UniProtKB/Swiss-Prot annotation:
Pathway: Sulfur metabolism; hydrogen sulfide biosynthesis; sulfite from sulfate: step 1/3
EC numbers for this chain: 2.7.7.4
Protein name (database record): Sulfate adenylyltransferase
Disulfide bond annotation, renumbered to this chain: none
Short name of one Pfam family: PUA_2
Enzyme class: transferase
Gene that this polypeptide is encoded by: sat
Keyword Nucleotide-binding: yes
UniProt keyword Transferase present: yes
Family as reported in the entry's similarity comment: Belongs to the sulfate adenylyltransferase family.
GO molecular function: ATP binding; sulfate adenylyltransferase (ATP) activity
Keywords, sorted A to Z: ATP-binding, Nucleotide-binding, Nucleotidyltransferase, Transferase
UniProt source species: Lactiplantibacillus plantarum (strain ATCC BAA-793 / NCIMB 8826 / WCFS1)
PANTHER family per the UniProt record, alphabetical: PTHR43509, SULFATE ADENYLYLTRANSFERASE
Length: 391
């Protein structure tokens, strides 16, 4: 049994449901199988490695309804976003309760098994409204929810095969491993940072403000499915490595991927992101403006307000920062809390504007993005376009 270092896992125990034995794999090949998508595979992996502790499988009806309606599991543990396995009615009809099934990817690989304990039909309109705060199909998370299978299967899983993370493999670690790493580094307070975007000056500023108060920064970028106009994960990873190389102390930061899909659930997803980082061993977590948001579906500081209301229950400390910008008169990064000057002296660009500049090959102002980082992003996006044109 491996030692679990650091902060207590969410719900009290760090889950590990991995079984990579040949005997288990061979037994799984004899089971009835269900083909699941990449989103489901990433959820399966996070349940299996303990990132989603205390979950031990895809949610059964009692947990699902409790989470949708009360933001807590049936056990009373806070949990904000349903982790479900949706299937078609036709597939559901073929699967009997209390049977074990193999979970396959489109590649034919058996990634895990599941003991089917429950089959139920969710109220997707209610789930959308309570989790995403909208039933609008233009919302990417809601769109995916509606496109998902109409029947949910619930039950305990085993992880038999981890997905190949390709170029990111050197930056992949499980919660047990990150906790040991923090222990070996002597870090007692670790602040986690979630991102699906490149790190620009505003992100750098709030990360370093937090880093002044803790032992180490756990930079944990999401590399699973995102929406089409987000910057691709492989391009972002190059930008992370570049900014860490030139602008961060090497002994105070660790870069590890978060192999999850992006739900764009705003405030509710901010809580999920914090739970996962707690399981990875973080004692602290940064909640920025419009955390996990998309479009205008959520208020600028709505995620911060929700997470403040559950801070004691979460058992973590949260860093919450105002919108930051570069002030020409101050000659530095600042927020409204620290800068007395007007908007005419502030340099700040939206993520959409910065993405367009980068796509057009334009280096944003150095007050917005580090030139080294911008160049890596421009080159990476250009390379992606060329690859797409070749196909």
């Amino acid at each position: 049994m491996q030692t679990v270092y650091g902060i207590k896992a969410h719900g009290g125990k760090l889950v590990n449901l991995e079984d990579f034995s040949e005997a288990t794999r061979q037994a799984a090949e004899q089971l009835p199988s269900l083909t699941i998508n990449n989103w489901n595979i990433s959820d399966l992996e996070l349940i299996g490695i303990g990132g989603f502790s205390p979950l031990t499988g895809f949610m059964v009806s009692d947990d699902y309804h409790s989470v949708v309606n009360t933001m807590h599991l049936k056990s009373g543990v806070i949990w904000s976003v349903p982790i479900t396995l949706g299937v078609s009615q036709a597939d559901a009809d073929k699967i009997e309760l209390n049977t074990k099934i193999a979970l396959k990817g489109a590649d034919g690989v058996i990634y895990g098994t599941m003991q089917v304990e429950d089959k139920f039909v969710p109220d997707k309109q209610l789930e959308a409204q309570n989790v995403y705060k909208t039933t609008d199909e233009a919302h990417p998370g809601v769109k995916r929810l509606y496109a998902n299978g109409d029947v949910y299967l619930g039950g305990a899983i085993k992880l038999l095969h981890k997905p190949d993370h390709g170029a990111f493999s050197d930056y992949y670690m499980e919660p047990l491993e990150t906790r040991k790493m923090f222990h070996d580094l002597g870090w007692k307070r670790i602040v986690g940072f979630q991102t699906r975007n490149p790190i620009h000056r505003a992100h750098e500023y709030i990360q370093k403000l937090a880093l002044e108060n803790v032992d180490g920064l756990f930079l944990n970028p999401l590399v699973g499915e995102t929406k089409a106009d987000d910057i691709p994960a492989d391009v972002r990873m190059e930008s992370y490595k570049t900014i860490l190389k030139y602008y961060y102390p090497e002994d105070r930061v660790r870069l590890v991927i978060y192999p999850a899909a992006m739900r764009y659930a705003g405030p509710k997803e901010a809580i999920l992101h914090a739970i996962v980082r707690k399981n990875y061993g973080c004692t602290d977590f940064i909640v920025g403006r419009d955390h996990a948001g998309v479009g205008d579906y959520y208020g600028t500081y709505e995620a911060q307000e929700l997470i403040t209301s559950v801070e004691d229950e979460m058992g973590m400390h949260f860093f919450k920062f105002d919108n930051s910008f570069y002030c020409k008169k101050c000659g530095s990064m600042a927020t409204q809390k620290t800068c007395p000057h007007g908007a005419e002296d502030h340099i700040s660009l939206s993520g959409t504007k910065v993405r367009k500049m980068l796509a057009d090959g334009v280096v944003p102002p150095k007050e917005v993005s580090r030139p080294e980082v911008a160049r890596v992003l421009i080159d990476g996006l250009k390379r992606k376009r060329e690859q797409q044109q070749e196909v």
